[in-house]
């Protein structure tokens, strides 16, 4: 009996070992991180209200996987900048948005990130985001950084050097955090978008810009009287225009 018990114990241990090493079920959500930065500077005042409403929809759509949007396993939302350059601001985690309606998310965003004449500091934002990702052990998970901003750095430009301020935007802390890192800039002018694409130095980080004129089109995709989970045009518009998969470094 003892040998049989020993064999049975060995088989059970092996089974437990195989169970512990088995991959996650196919229905589980793959790890991926969404970081959003909201511009509260005076230069963004014109687009602030529209941007807050879109950000609330964007978060709601992703958190609920509407229209096939990727569901993030980690979310951090903060402001881009502060009262002075280099000021570190708090990020709100995914728990602050889960279970809320679009209206509730928008109200929270307005409360946490009121429109103020603050300094826009992209480099500090990227650095803080990278620190959070490392602390939360999210390295290697696909990283999506969405900047809801006009993209104007608060750095004076030398005469004739239009790209100078953009060359000072440091995305270095985001490099090598993941095999797939994309920075998406929403609401810039076409000129600012080109300056980001040409002036911001990067290696593995991919950059995607959506002009303010294009962003204005999201409202046209909504069908009155149709619930959000059936707003297929809206979610497809977001997938095609905002979440566009950048396969290579642009410019």
Residue positions per predicted region:
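C-terminal motif of bacterial Sec signal peptides marking the signal peptidase cleavage site
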Residues: 17-20
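Bacterial signal peptide processing site
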Residues: 22-24
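Von Willebrand factor
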Residues: 30-93, 96-142, 144-146, 188-189
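Short beta-strand-loop
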Residues: 76-110, 198-201
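Exposed acidic/Ser/Thr-rich ligand/metal-binding surfaces
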Residues: 119-172
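VWA/integrin I-like adhesion module and closely mimicked acidic/polar interface patches used
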Residues: 152-203
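P/S/T/G-enriched low-complexity
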Residues: 191-251
């Amino acid at each position: 009996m003892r040998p049989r018990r020993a064999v049975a114990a060995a088989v059970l241990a092996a089974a437990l070992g195989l169970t512990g090493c088995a991959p996650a079920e196919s229905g589980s959500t793959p790890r991926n991180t969404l970081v959003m930065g909201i511009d509260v500077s005076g230069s963004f005042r014109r687009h602030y209200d529209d941007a807050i409403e879109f950000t609330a929809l964007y978060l709601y759509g992703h958190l609920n996987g509407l229209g096939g949007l990727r569901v993030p396993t980690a979310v951090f939302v903060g402001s881009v900048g502060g009262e002075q350059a280099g000021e570190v601001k708090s990020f709100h985690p995914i728990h602050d948005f889960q279970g809320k309606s679009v209206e509730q998310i928008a109200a929270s965003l307005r409360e946490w990130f009121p429109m103020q004449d603050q300094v826009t500091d992209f480099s500090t934002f990227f650095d803080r985001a990278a620190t959070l990702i490392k602390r939360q052990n999210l390295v290697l998970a696909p990283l999506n950084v969405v900047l809801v901003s006009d993209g104007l750095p608060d750095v004076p430009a030398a005469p004739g050097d239009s790209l100078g301020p953009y060359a000072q935007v440091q995305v270095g802390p985001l490099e090598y955090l993941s095999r797939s890192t994309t920075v998406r800039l929403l609401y810039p002018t076409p000129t600012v978008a080109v300056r980001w694409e040409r002036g911001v130095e990067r290696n593995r980080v991919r950059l995607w810009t959506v002009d303010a004129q294009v962003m204005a089109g999201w409202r046209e995709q909504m069908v009155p009287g149709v619930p959000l989970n059936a707003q297929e045009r809206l979610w497809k518009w977001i997938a095609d225009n905002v979440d566009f998969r950048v396969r290579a470094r642009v410019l």
